[in-house]
């Protein structure tokens, strides 16, 4: 479990780096493209990212499910550590943009945040499953690329990315925690929707 937690911290860190790139550029299309570095490293290095691992909870035993809270906490630690470190550098200037993003996210009705989180992890599943199952190398990476770019450009809610934005924007509050939990549940629902649909259609 310790190795899983450490792997989850690293996963949170690379997602935070993706978020850093997104905050650093004005063009959201460019930002979405380079945000893909996070999921790319997670998949190629086998790191533990909650939004990816939760997709396969029904394909594994209870021991697998018990690792998910550990992974979530590790992701939170990783994103928070990167945000804290960045605030000790000139990258602290990114906090203003992060604050604006957080204000927008926290102004969404809870139902809306949940739905956007469901949609997000449908895209994550498409990306991760495409990487896992596509026999062609180019196809693997295109799956990651399109899955991430679509969820970002559509404004869908990714709980781990939001951990970073909340930390960088100094937006943590009871309301932010509530929203993050709702988004986490939405990500879980969206993540399992793909595998469940695949099983139903294959009968």
Where are each of the predicted segments found?
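Alpha-helical transmembrane segments and their helix-helix packing motifs
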Residues: 1-203
């Amino acid at each position: 479990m310790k190795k899983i937690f450490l792997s989850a911290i690293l996963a949170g860190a690379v997602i935070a780096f993706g978020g850093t790139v997104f905050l650093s550029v004005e063009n959201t299309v460019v930002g979405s493209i380079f945000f893909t570095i996070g999921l790319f490293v997670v998949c190629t290095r086998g790191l533990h990212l909650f939004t990816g691992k939760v997709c396969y909870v029904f394909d594994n035993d209870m021991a697998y499910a018990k690792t998910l809270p550990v992974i979530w906490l590790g992701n939170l630690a990783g994103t928070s550590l990167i945000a804290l470190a960045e605030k000790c550098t000139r990258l602290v200037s990114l906090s203003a943009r992060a604050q604006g993003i957080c204000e927008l996210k926290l102004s969404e009705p809870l139902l809306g945040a949940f739905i956007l989180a469901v949609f997000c992890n449908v895209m994550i599943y498409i990306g991760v499953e495409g990487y896992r199952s596509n026999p062609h190398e180019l196809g693997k990476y295109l799956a990651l690329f399109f899955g991430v770019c679509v969820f970002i450009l559509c404004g869908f809610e990714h709980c781990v990315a939001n951990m970073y934005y909340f930390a960088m924007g100094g937006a943590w509050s009871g309301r932010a925690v509530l929203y993050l939990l709702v988004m986490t549940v939405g990500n879980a629902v969206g993540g399992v929707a793909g595998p469940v649909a695949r099983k139903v259609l294959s009968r």
